[in-house]
């Protein structure tokens, strides 16, 4: 299942993302973050981290450098 999600994100990166103007406010981009989170923390934790990041990426967000955390926690981080 983890591999399937990574394939879906890579499909998005290759075929859908180039058709849109760049809008991600973070570094690494949300799609790269999602893949890194899945690879580092596995399916459930990576999915949680990736979805949480996508929700945070909006016009009201300050954005900036936001790497995948080394340690996983369900606690929300304050910036």
From Swiss-Prot:
Superkingdom to which the source organism belongs: Bacteria
GO cellular component: plasma membrane
Major localization class: membrane
InterPro entries cross-referenced by the UniProt entry: Membr_insert_effic_factor_YidD
Record's subcellular location: Cell inner membrane
One Pfam family linked to the record: YidD
Membrane topology summary: Peripheral membrane protein
Keywords from the named record: Cell inner membrane, Cell membrane, Membrane
Described function: Could be involved in insertion of integral membrane proteins into the membrane.
Protein family according to the UniProt entry: Belongs to the UPF0161 family.
NCBIfam families for the chain: membrane protein insertion efficiency factor YidD
Protein name as catalogued: Putative membrane protein insertion efficiency factor
Species, as recorded: Thermotoga neapolitana (strain ATCC 49049 / DSM 4359 / NBRC 107923 / NS-E)
């Amino acid at each position: 299942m983890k591999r399937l999600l990574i394939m879906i994100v890579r499909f998005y990166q290759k075929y859908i993302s180039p058709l849109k103007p760049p809008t991600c406010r973070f570094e690494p981009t949300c799609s790269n973050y999602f893949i890194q989170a899945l690879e580092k923390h596995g399916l459930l934790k990576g999915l949680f981290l990736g979805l949480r990041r996508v929700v945070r990426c909006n016009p009201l967000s300050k954005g900036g450098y936001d790497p995948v955390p080394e340690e996983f926690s369900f606690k929300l981080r304050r910036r």
